[in-house]
Amino acid sequence: SPLPLMVGFGGINPAGRASFHHAYRRLVIDKLDQEKQDGTFASLAKLMRLDGNSQDSTVRQYIKDHTLIRKIEIFDPDAVNWHSSATLKNTDAKSITFKIPTKQLPETIPSNWSLTKINDKETQIICEESLSVLLPDERVSKVTSAGQVPSGFDPAALYASRSHPRGLQLTVYGASDAIQSTGFKVEELRNLVRPDEIAVYSGSAMGQLDNDAYGGLLQNPLTGRRPTSKHCALGLPEMPGDFVNAYILGSVGETAGIIGACATFLYNVKRAIDDIRSGNKRVVIVGNSEAPVVPHVIEGYRVMGALAEDEELKALDDSDICDNRRACRPFSSNAGFTCAEASIWLVLMDDQLALESGARILGSVPDVFVHADGYKKSIPGPGIGNYLTVAKAMASAKNLLGEQVLRQGSFMQAHGTG
């Protein structure tokens, strides 16, 4: 059967641009030789729109400080918008009296209100009882660490974004980076096969939850604003794949969005390799985009006890200062994981097409295994499915390469939820 091969990869994450290993080089930049360090810093300086010389030590330190995990910059964690509920009562026996612009009157007037028109623009309200209100407030977030794309990188400025949610902005950049990494132009890649032999499989586990999508849809009515015509559609979790088809590839081939928490990317890769191995597809673009660094998502994960809070990190370090840079410690003493944004994409081909087209072969994806955990008391807790997945993956590698290569010439890349 056809073997699925990787012929391109790319995207954007807190370490920078993924294609050609730029992001990986940022992770190990202190261990690179001088030439590769220079190239990595130059790439990041361009991405971050820095005016200074990337050879300058001050610029290099700025690049280091404003990539990877760090204190949240996307919003101000020291002033998160909030509403505090309150009950207003009169200070004496009199009723509560106030006036507001007439156009701000609610559509449904409370039964304990008496209205008196002052003029064409204002109305006086007399409230016979106590008045329940929401007071605009600001709170300090208990979580201030996140993985964010490099400071200064603005995906919305690179195309006509038209109020697109951040996750979809990252999608356009990430998928474009992956396709260009193949060396083929979009038209060339599309014309290698028949229209129904190319597919895009992608999703977003969280969907788009900022104010330009589901965040605005759900919050605007409670904050005195209206939802827009884009909020509902652009929040759908399969929208990253739709954006690739519509804005980048112009494909009329098959598309799908498979969602599964932190395994969303793997679910879509599995669909891709199954289709290539069966001969149904010859080119598949597969990826995932997540942009969960928004206040209500951070708070949602925090209250379920999933995120590393600042006070807990201070306690781990026995310090009065939260070290945001070291918030993610998946294989060490930790207090929870750290949210991050990213958009990562693969371009897969069957082996025959890759050889015929002269594509640059980066590796193969022979199998993907995903198993449920059976009965368990806690959904997020570890389960037997992990053991089944690893066992089948090792058996597949043994069948392909032999036991000696499996034991002595292979390695396991551990996934630590950080």
Feature map (PLM): residue ranges:
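ACP-dependent fatty acid/polyketide chain-elongation machinery
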Residues: 1-160, 351-365
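Conserved small-residue
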Residues: 175, 200, 265, 272, ...
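Short acidic, glycine/serine/threonine-rich loops at helix termini
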Residues: 211-215, 268-270, 294-300, 359, ...
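Active-site-proximal alpha-helical scaffold in enzymes
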Residues: 170-184, 237, 241, 255-290, ...
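Beta-strand segments within the central parallel beta-sheet cores of soluble alpha/beta enzyme folds
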Residues: 188-199, 255-260, 284-289, 360-369, ...
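Condensing-enzyme catalytic core mediating Claisen C-C bond formation in acyl metabolism
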Residues: 2-10, 14, 312-411
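Conserved catalytic cysteine-centered active-site region
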Residues: 45, 122-169, 207-271, 304, ...
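Hydrophobic alpha-helical hairpins/lids featuring a short glycine-rich hinge
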Residues: 168-228
